[in-house]
């Protein structure tokens, strides 16, 4: 029996898509670019959405659009609605596509970003077989350009390759929980062997800040880097995805420079196009605009404490 005293609202998907863009990008101007509308059109859409649901979604503080308590609550539902809508449409479009997709990923995405992508792909393409290759980012990019893999998740943004930004994550200085570092002393670094973007970043940032450094341990795998840092052999630089209870974060309080965010991309090679790869890439690209992999957030001080097992679930 229908309760006529509370009419059911039919939410406009365009309004939801714009709302999620504003929530993720924090300004109407940035969201307008993302959804291909004018800034005034985005503002009008958000007014319509607030009128429709009868709640204020944004706090009125300057240009940055911070979510109210109702806005935060509504954002989770908006993402789910868009996800189900997009997956339903995509599954009907691509349900008959068969074949094998080869995805390449680096160590630091293998247990964080990769599972999310695999879930998305299998939901939309149920008849698809997937092969995964885990190697260093530079090697993955070479394999992609050689046509040995179809898609790659990497931190390297090659403008010559079509790519989708999957996530932006804080980049942090890590040491073991009981590691002692005094501001001004030589930084002992634990790094991957070259080529490594995080190694290069650490050296460049310390050199630019005039902080003395030395390489105390060189590893060939990320697991070896983790082990060396946990053993107290030195400090390393990685994105927030590496955080674990055995590690702690160093930063500006210890005199270390603030690091630029890490961006994770999904790339394909236009010289090795095929229907399968193009369909999957397009499905993921459309998904990231509305509900996939929201930006990892948090101030340095908030990220200093080791996360609980429960909080780590939010990363994936």
UniProtKB/Swiss-Prot annotation:
Residues 301-316 have a biased composition (Basic and acidic residues). GO terms for molecular function: DNA binding; DNA-binding transcription factor activity. The gene is pecT. This is HTH-type transcriptional regulator PecT. Pfam families: HTH_1 (PF00126), LysR_substrate (PF03466). Keywords: DNA-binding, Transcription, Transcription regulation. Regulates pectinase gene expression. The keyword Transcription applies.
């Amino acid at each position: 029996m229908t309760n006529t005293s509370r009419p059911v609202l039919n939410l406009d998907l365009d309004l939801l898509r714009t709302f999620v863009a504003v929530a993720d990008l924090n300004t109407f101007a940035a969201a307008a670019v993302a959804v291909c509308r004018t800034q005034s059109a985005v503002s009008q859409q958000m007014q319509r959405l607030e009128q429709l649901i009868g709640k204020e979604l944004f706090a009125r503080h300057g240009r940055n659009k911070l979510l109210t308590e109702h806005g935060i609550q509504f954002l989770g539902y908006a993402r789910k609605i868009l996800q189900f809508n997009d997956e339903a449409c995509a599954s009907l479009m691509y349900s008959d596509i068969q074949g094998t997709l080869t995805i390449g990923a680096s160590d630091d995405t293998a247990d964080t970003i990769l599972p999310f992508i695999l879930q998305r792909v299998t939901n939309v393409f149920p008849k698809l077989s997937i092969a995964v290759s885990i190697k260093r980012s530079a090697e993955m990019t070479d394999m992609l350009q050689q046509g040995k893999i179809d898609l790659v998740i990497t931190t390297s943004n090659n403008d010559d390759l079509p790519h989708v930004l999957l996530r932006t994550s804080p980049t942090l200085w890590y040491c073991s929980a009981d590691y002692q570092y005094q501001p001004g002393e030589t930084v002992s670094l634990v790094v991957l062997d070259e080529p490594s973007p995080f190694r290069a970043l650490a050296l460049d940032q310390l050199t630019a800040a005039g902080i003395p450094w030395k390489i105390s341990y060189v590893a060939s795998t990320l697991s070896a880097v983790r082990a060396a840092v946990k053993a107290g052999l030195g400090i390393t630089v990685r994105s927030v995805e590496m955080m674990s209870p055995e590690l702690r974060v160093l930063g500006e309080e210890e005199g270390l420079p603030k690091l630029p965010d890490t961006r994770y991309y999904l790339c394909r090679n236009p010289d090795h196009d095929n229907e399968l790869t193009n369909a999957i890439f397009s499905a993921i690209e459309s998904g990231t605009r509305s509900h996939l992999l929201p930006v990892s957030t948090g101030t340095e001080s908030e990220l200093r404490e080791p996360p609980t097992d429960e909080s780590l679930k939010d990363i994936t």
